[in-house]
Regions:
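Polybasic low-complexity intrinsically disordered regions
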Residues: 112-285, 289, 294-302, 306-309
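Basic, amphipathic alpha-helical segments enriched in Lys/Arg and hydrophobic/aromatic residues
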Residues: 423-490
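Charged, often Cys/His-bearing segments associated with DNA-binding zinc-finger transcription factors
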Residues: 1-45, 476-490
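Basic, short loop/linker segments at the boundary and entry of helix-turn-helix/winged-helix-like folds
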Residues: 27-70, 74
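DNA-recognition alpha helix
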Residues: 79-95, 130
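Major-groove recognition helix of helix-turn-helix-like DNA-binding domains
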Residues: 96-113
Length: 490
């Protein structure tokens, strides 16, 4: 017999109340329970937004900021589509704190009017997430990786037909004049294109990922975990604040121009980063071959470049293929490792690092053709060279000491060609993956605007969203989600 239960009005009310309170998407509940947006927003931002002068705000600061963060978490490509989501989703609207959905112009004005305040939110989150990164992996959190890219603006010059038309004309010109095979129409096209977009002189020509484009250039600093630590937007204000940067005329080589420009931007960008976050003191720098210059090694590894006795201990930078290494004291291979005097193809074996009384390091290299032999009388082991053509009369074989401070380019606190170098330098790709992530997944690519402030704000908001991701992943004890929350949404 089926038992019957008498329903009371109180039970019906209780069920309805429970449904009303709990019928909310789980992901929004996670954000609501674990992220305190008031803790992240500086009081100066709140005072600026709710200034005593001007009109009363119809839309709360928290609501606007949450909406823009949600847009990037869900990879909603346009502001108009975000507003459509808000209009049709009551739970999303209530979570953000809107009683009425704003129009698109409100979103745009918010970005443009409060760009400096958004930067403060980002900087606040960097300090908040630093201990989280160290708790996840202290070694990778101590790394600093830099790379640059650009936000493509919505201008005529970024239409693929624009570059293709010029290249096609140059190919036809070369064919008509019987140019030899050394003529490169792509380099010629780069040289003939204008240095900036006609709509805005601040939208500069750049060669990114194998194609020509017109962009607002920016720089990204991440740690070894791929978490953003600093964003620099290379506009007129940045150049004014760093008069030491001299912008030269472009050459015929787009790759060369990018390398030269990146090398000039590195130290000013790092100085800005360490000035904003004096408690962050990473010891390892990773960069590509664009930074392979004696001047940069000296600034990165010695002196007070980033503060009182504040500099990197190691710099993982591959050698530029156009310039090799030379050592007046001994023969060295392409990685700076000393070679046997009788055989240039035989590198010596790294046998450890020692620190002298004055604190300076030296690297010890020994002949690879030695073995340790036990002395029967003393019971101790000693080196014995078994080379058929020894380069020295010493029984221990050739031993060479290298002093890194004499040549920081050859020995930037570490030794190229070793297993440690290979394993560490692979981590540098984290910054490239991060740039791709903020462009493709955090809605930075494909923005249909050429307004500098709007795109700058979009870049900062992408950084804010990634750091919010780190905070939430830490709160729910799932560090595998520090780069993306998409698995939690599905």
């Amino acid at each position: 017999m089926i038992p019957y239960k008498q329903l009371s009005l109180a039970d019906i009310f209780s069920d309805c109340q429970d449904k009303f309170e709990n019928d909310k998407p789980v992901f929004l509940s996670l954000l609501e329970n674990h992220i305190d947006i008031d803790e992240i927003i500086p009081i100066s931002f709140r005072n600026h937004f709710y200034a005593s002068t001007g009109r009363t705000r119809k839309y709360p600061l928290n609501a606007l900021l949450w909406a823009l963060i949600i847009q990037r978490i869900f990879s909603i490509p346009t502001d108009q589509l975000l507003l459509t989501f808000l209009a049709y989703s009551k739970p999303l609207r209530e979570f953000c704190g809107f009683t009425k959905v704003p129009d698109a112009s409100k979103i745009t004005r918010f970005k443009q009017d409060f760009i400096d305040d958004l930067q403060l939110v980002f900087d606040n989150l960097v300090d908040l997430t630093e201990p989280i990164c160290h708790a996840i992996d202290s070694a990778k959190a101590d790394m600093t990786i830099f790379d640059s890219s650009g936000i493509e603006a919505f201008v005529t010059e970024n239409n693929p037909k624009y570059a293709n038309r010029i290249i096609k004309q140059l190919k036809a010109y070369a064919k008509a004049n019987n140019f030899d095979k050394s003529y490169d129409p792509y380099k010629a096209a780069y040289g003939s294109m204008p240095t900036h977009a006609s709509a805005n002189p601040e939208i500069k020509q750049l060669y990114i990922n194998g194609h020509f484009c017109y962009v607002f250039k920016f720089g990204i600093i991440t740690n070894g975990l791929g978490i953003i630590r600093h964003i620099s937007f290379y506009n007129k204000d940045f150049m004014i604040s760093h008069p030491e940067i001299v912008v030269e005329k472009k050459s015929d080589s787009p790759d060369e121009d990018k390398c030269v420009h990146d090398a000039k931007l590195l130290i000013p960008t790092l100085k800005d980063f360490f000035a904003k976050h004096p408690l962050i003191n990473p010891k390892t720098f990773l960069g590509d071959a664009a930074f392979d210059s004696c001047r940069l090694y000296k600034e990165l590894l010695t002196g007070n470049t980033f503060g009182e006795n504040k500099h990197f201990s190691k710099a993982y930078i591959p050698l530029n293929s156009r310039s090799g290494l030379e050592n007046p004291d001994c023969k060295v291979n392409e990685n700076g490792i000393p070679c046997c005097p009788n055989d240039d193809s035989l590198p010596l074996k790294h046998d450890g690092t020692s620190t002298r009384k004055n604190g300076l390091k030296r690297y010890k290299f020994v002949c690879p053709k030695i073995k340790r032999v036990k002395d029967a009388s003393t019971g101790k082991y000693h080196r014995h060279c078994i080379c058929d053509n020894p380069c020295t009369t010493s029984e221990c074989g050739r031993i060479i000491y290298v002093y890194p401070e004499k040549d920081l380019r050859a020995y930037p606190g570490t030794i190229r060609g070793t297993e440690e170098w290979d394993n560490t330098y692979k981590i540098r790709t984290a910054v490239e993956r991060d740039i791709n992530h903020i462009k493709e997944n955090l809605c930075l690519a494909g923005r249909r605007t050429q307004n500098e402030k709007t795109l700058h704000a979009d870049l900062i908001l992408a950084g804010i969203t990634q750091l919010i991701t780190v905070v939430l992943a830490d709160k729910i004890k799932h560090h595998e989600y520090i780069r993306s929350l998409k698995p939690l949404i599905a």
